[in-house]
Amino acid sequence: MDGIKKKMIAMKLEKENAMERAVQYEAQLKQKEEEQEKKETEIGELNNRMKQAQTELDEIQEALQDSLNKMEETDKRATNAEAEVARMTRRIRLLEEDLEVSSSRLTETLAKFDEASKTAEESERGRKELEIRSIADDEGLSQLEDQQKEGKYIAEDADRKYDEAARKLAIVEVDFERAESRLEAAESKIVELEEELRVVGNNMKALEISEQESAQREESYEETIRDLTERLKAAEQRAAEAERQVSKLQNEVDHLEDDLLSEKIRYKDLSGGLDQTFAELTGY
């Protein structure tokens, strides 16, 4: 009888210990589940941060590409403007050369005209002298007539030369007027080109400023990208560490659940043994 009582007391103590361990296991299990839930929440937040960082990185890369495209387009416009300026400069140089040629031709024609005028004046003076001599000396009339004819021929030849010089002068004047028109057009174009050059210069200054700002923005973008990349790597490392901790907690939870199940089985066995012992005592 004493042995049965001792056995009952021992079984009761073991039952109480088993219940206490079961309560501890349940508390630990609850704590581990809370920790696991917390870690899963942290993993979700990290995933959201990683997605946000990736989105920001994509936006920055897109903005950087847009800036590079704008810089390329601006450089292309500046190159085209420089080519246009060079082309117009060549045209101005050709016009200036044409004007020099026309001026030279005009000077040459005027010189020939002066020479023809002098020849005509000399012929006229010779004719008048012949007329005077013919009046003064009847005997030399025939000679004077010959001289008069010669003078007339010289005068006619001078007139022809004068007409030819006048015709050439008219042509030169037309060429000169055209050259003046081209010169005026060239001067107007020069003014226009100077204005365009001024605008291009201002645009180039603006482009240089924009390029400097773009370079600064690019450096800022690159720094932001590096920062985001580091943050992304850190977030990935934290996420991996959190997943490892969750896996570890899951293993601990599984182990605690196994221990709790074992304790419940032991408790059930002890309860069965106590019931059997009570039945035996009742039988006595």
Curated annotation (Swiss-Prot):
Q: Which InterPro entries does the record associate with it?
A: Tropomyosin
Q: Provide the domain comment.
A: The molecule is in a coiled coil structure that is formed by 2 polypeptide chains. The sequence exhibits a prominent seven-residues periodicity.
Q: Give the UniProt family note.
A: Belongs to the tropomyosin family.
List the PANTHER family hit by this protein, alphabetically: TROPOMYOSIN
Q: Where is this region: Disordered?
A: 29-49, 111-149
Q: Which UniProt keywords apply?
A: Coiled coil, Repeat
Segments of skewed composition (Basic and acidic residues): 29-42, 111-136
Q: What is this protein called?
A: Tropomyosin
Q: Which species is this record about?
A: Clonorchis sinensis (Chinese liver fluke)
